[in-house]
Structures are given as C-alpha cells and as structure tokens.
Amino acid sequence: MTEPFLEKVKLSLPVGLWIENCMSSGLDPATIIAYIHNKDWTPLLSNVADPQMDMLDRLQIATDMNDPWEQAILEGYRFKFIHIGGVKRLLYFRYQLQEHRDYQQNGNQLSGLLLHSDMISNINEKIGIQWEIVTDTQTLSNTQTMQIRLKNESC
C-alpha cells in the first residue's frame, strides 16, 4: 500500500512555506488562488502569519521551479525536502505552534508537541518522506504528546 503523502504533488521548501503562509489567512483556497493570480496581496498580507514574506518573490520562485502551487492549494502537497527550521515554520504557519512555548528542539528533534490525530495526519502528509512523528505520551483525549524527528536517526 502506498503512503498517502507519496501521492501528493511535491513542492520546494520556499513555495510550500509560501502556500502555508497564504493558507494561514483563513481564506478559502479559491479566494487565495484568485488573489495570487491578480497579484492582489493586501487581503492576504493583512491576515497571514508572516506579513513580511515577499509574496511576489515566492510566486516567481514557484514559477521558476515549475512548482504546481495551485494544485497544492486545492489538493494538498508534500515537501521535496524540509530541514528542521522549515518544520518549525510549518508548525507555526499551520498551527501557531512556537518553540519554547509549545515544544522544545534538541538537535534534529522537536519534542513535547501536543497534537490531535488530524494534526498528526496533516503534518505527516507534508513531511513524512523525511521525518517521522512518534508518540512521547498518550493522553485520554484525542490529543497526544508527540515528537518529530528525522527518520533513521537514533534518539
């Protein structure tokens, strides 16, 4: 059986984080795509997690790299490659999780993340080719304390 994340389109790190920043606006995907096509950044920049991100530059990177950004917004995606800093930005854009407040970093490992099962699935879809999400502790609710670490790296 094929892992679901293997079927998703692959994006470069700058484009994937751009998509996550755009999605952090809370606007629906079709509206985001329309704003991007029109290069109308004001509605996005007033609502995104990182309003300092150069949207036009990221669109140019997506175009230059032939990254299928529209399909990624509509259907989901996975990163071609993502380093620990990118994982931390993903967690911030997607779930407003921050180091020292919501988790701790120890080398190439993030621990103490309180994640619901749908969050685990979404994160795994995007980074699962390179990173693994493992249980630190199980709680009685749908929330688990998790850690994200590089695959094949001993703890």
Which residues fall in each region the model found?
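Structural boundary micro-motifs
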Residues: 1-155
